Amino acid sequence: MYYPLLSIALGSVLGAWLRWFLGLKLNPIYPQIPLGTVTVNLVGGFIIGFAMAYFAHSDLSPNYKLFVITGFCGALTTFSTFSIEIVTLLQSGKWGMAMLAISIHLIGSLIFTCLGLAAYYWVAGH
């Protein structure tokens, strides 16, 4: 009964720690479009794409899916952080940079989700 809750909680802790670490290390490199936020959204898109395909063909306990998708990816990806970064750019009058950041996050995440799906099918030989 508690395994789903524990699965989500443990995945969330690990995802949040990784998000914090990548933000700490990568955001100072190019603050106009914080690379930590971009990285976690792209990596999260890849992981969720791969995981969805994997779990669709797996007999593993649903708790593993909760751990990876709901917990880890849910804590790793950063829509709220992305939103405030875009609003800050807009408030600073940096409309072009805001549109570039939106494009990178949205298109990049979709591409990386597709790459994750494709990677699973390539690895699994489907």
UniProtKB/Swiss-Prot annotation:
Keyword Calcium in annotation: no
Family in the record: Belongs to the fluoride channel Fluc/FEX (TC 1.A.43) family.
HAMAP family recorded: FluC (MF_00454)
Transmembrane segments: 4-24, 33-53, 67-87, 97-117
Binding residues annotated for Na(+), in chain numbering: 74, 77
Protein name per its UniProtKB record: Fluoride-specific ion channel FluC
GO molecular function, one term: metal ion binding
Protein purpose: Fluoride-specific ion channel. Important for reducing fluoride concentration in the cell, thus reducing its toxicity.
Record-level GO cellular component terms: plasma membrane
Keyword Hydrolase: no
UniProt note on regulation of activity: Na(+) is not transported, but it plays an essential structural role and its presence is essential for fluoride channel function.
Any GO BP: cellular detoxification of fluoride
Matching Pfam families: CRCB
Signal peptide region: none
Catalytic activity: fluoride(in) = fluoride(out)
Keywords per UniProt: Cell inner membrane, Cell membrane, Ion channel, Ion transport, Membrane, Metal-binding, Sodium, Transmembrane, Transmembrane helix, Transport
Organism of provenance: Acinetobacter baumannii (strain ATCC 17978 / DSM 105126 / CIP 53.77 / LMG 1025 / NCDC KC755 / 5377)
